[in-house]
Design a protein with these regions (language model features):
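Active-site nucleophile-adjacent alpha helix/oxyanion-hole segment immediately C-terminal to the catalytic cysteine
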Residues: 2-114
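Conserved active-site-adjacent core of cysteine acyl-enzyme catalytic domains
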Residues: 28-36, 96-230
């Protein structure tokens, strides 16, 4: 059975035939235009992710998207990490209150991404894309690519697109059941899979692409179905 996002993907394909979208130039990211010294919060090392003694997990059950956005913003711009390490009006004190500032930052981002959407329902992918555009421009622009995971061809297309994007930047993914439920962040390719930050656990896990095709993501990401990828625009 198709997911909500799968039905959305089918509707979008019909509308695109009626009203073809004009191609847009792909925005370059900092890694393609300059030599930025990266200070990512989340590394691509498998296992639990910590910074200044704090586990980098989501602060509550509705902030998986916010944790992913903070991780992506920190990858793109070291100022994000500096903000988290520095108390208001003070100098950088790595480890002194970092965890509470990290949690507060997630809640701030959650509010900024949900201007017209109930916060209890998490973050919409369009809200996430808008937040990256407005608050993390160094990450480059993203767009929402819905997935019909009942179509092998559609899944193959999105796997190829995510793999290509991972050569230059991380890619947020939205997974769920019949409805979308959870954000994770694909960090880089690893053989026949991807290394993915899963914010409920605060871990980077290896996702075999075979389970994406077979709709069996739950043992790794908590939910079986791939709903969307936020791809470079």
């Amino acid at each position: 059975m198709r997911t909500v996002s799968g039905f959305g993907r089918q509707v979008g394909k019909v509308l695109s035939r009626v009203r073809p979208r004009r191609s847009r130039p792909v925005a370059l990211v900092a890694s393609e235009t300059s030599t930025v010294e990266r200070r990512p919060l989340v590394s691509d090392r498998l296992g639990e992710q910590r910074h200044a003694g704090a586990v980098l997990d989501q602060v509550d059950g509705t902030t998986c998207g916010s944790a992913v956005l903070v991780a992506l913003a920190a990858w793109a711009d070291p100022a994000e990490v500096n903000r988290l390490e520095t108390p208001a009006g003070g100098k950088s004190l790595v480890g002194a209150g970092f965890g509470s500032r990290y949690d507060a930052r997630q809640k701030q981002v959650h509010g900024e991404t949900n201007r017209f959407w109930p916060q209890a329902l998490g973050t919409t992918p369009w809200g996430a894309v808008r937040w990256l555009r407005d608050h993390a421009p160094a990450a480059g622009r993203y767009r929402v690519r819905l997935v019909d995971d009942t179509s092998a061809a559609d899944v193959a297309q999105v796997i190829d697109a995510v793999g290509a994007a991972l050569a230059s930047r991380p890619v947020p993914l939205l997974v769920g059941s019949f409805v979308p439920r959870h954000y994770v962040l694909a960090l880089r390719a690893d053989g026949a899979g991807w290394r993915v930050y899963e914010p409920t656990s605060g871990q980077v896990r290896l996702l075999d692409l075979a389970v994406v095709r077979e709709r069996r993501l739950a043992p790794v990401l908590g939910f079986d179905r791939l709903h969307a990828a936020l791809l470079p625009s």
